[in-house]
């Protein structure tokens, strides 16, 4: 089996532990059934069906790990199904799988290490503060919902934690950058930075909300999207310089 992101294994182990707890509770409480209140008795009745559903979720996660590199989309579908069944814990598995998915899709390109000291002509960074603000908003709202008794708050807290961890990670990668005749780009929140010739890119869409780029090389033909909300507010001029270079890749400014 090929190497996987550590979050995949952590997520899978946590989901298995949770499934074990769900399977154990009914047998542990059955001897005391007559002493339990009505709601707890109803919970004992429902948990076997939850166990079946979660067993299916684990099966979907395991199946997603068996797909070869030439079928990443199909593997991602199973990973999403299996992860969603286990939310909020399932988010850990999903995030790890998204890292692996992007790694496979862009495997033909050269990856750029964190904090790479390259002679950037133009550098566009992610808006870390926006990521942190969103993480805090989800976490605080989730805690409030949990306090008032709404279990959905747990999902929001989990999302907030994932966003916070990723905000710290993403600050070490450029969103877009130009070094020589190459474009460095991070194709998603859960991906690393890659490098390809400027001539391999075509601007598909450039509007107020998003930028879509088409990359075509001998091994890769793909469109990816960059949300402009992830840019710093004063970075439009920097983005314009990058777009100008993409339209005229041989011109050095």
Located regions from the model:
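Conserved beta-hairpin
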Residues: 163-195
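N-terminal membrane-targeting/pre-transmembrane regions
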Residues: 1-12, 37-39, 99-143
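Membrane-interface segments at the starts/ends of alpha-helical transmembrane spans
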Residues: 37-48, 77
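Phosphoinositide-dependent membrane-docking surfaces
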Residues: 183-184, 192-212
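Membrane-interfacial loop-to-transmembrane alpha-helix junctions, especially the N-terminal start
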Residues: 4-9, 68-76
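Central hydrophobic cores of alpha-helical transmembrane segments
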Residues: 75-83
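Alpha-helical transmembrane spans
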Residues: 16-31, 44-70, 81, 91-100, ...
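Canonical phosphoinositide-binding patch of PH/PH-like domains
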Residues: 212-241
């Amino acid at each position: 089996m090929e190497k996987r992101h550590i979050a995949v294994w952590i997520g899978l182990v946590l989901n298995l532990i949770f499934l074990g707890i769900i399977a154990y509770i009914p047998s542990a409480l059955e001897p005391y059934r007559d002493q339990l209140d009505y709601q707890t008795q109803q919970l004992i009745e429902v948990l076997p069906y939850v166990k079946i559903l979660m067993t299916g979720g684990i099966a979907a996660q395991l199946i997603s790990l068996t797909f070869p590199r030439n079928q990443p989309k199909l593997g991602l579908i199973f990973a999403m199904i299996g992860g969603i069944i286990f939310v909020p814990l399932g988010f850990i598995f999903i995030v790890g799988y998204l890292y692996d998915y992007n790694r496979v899709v862009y495997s033909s390109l050269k990856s750029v290490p964190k904090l790479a000291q390259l002679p950037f002509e133009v550098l566009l960074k992610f808006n870390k503060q926006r990521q942190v603000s969103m993480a805090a908003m989800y976490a605080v709202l989730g805690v409030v919902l949990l306090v008032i008794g709404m279990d959905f708050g747990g999902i929001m807290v989990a999302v907030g934690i994932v966003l916070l961890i990723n905000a710290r990670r993403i600050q070490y990668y450029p969103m877009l950058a130009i070094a020589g005749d190459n474009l460095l780009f991070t194709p998603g929140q859960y991906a690393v930075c890659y490098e390809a010739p400027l001539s391999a890119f075509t601007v598909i869409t450039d509007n107020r909300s998003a930028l879509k780029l088409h990359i075509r090389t001998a091994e890769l033909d793909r469109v990816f999207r960059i949300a402009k909300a992830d840019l710093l507010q004063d970075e439009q001029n920097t983005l314009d310089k990058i777009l100008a270079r993409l339209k005229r890749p041989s011109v050095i400014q």
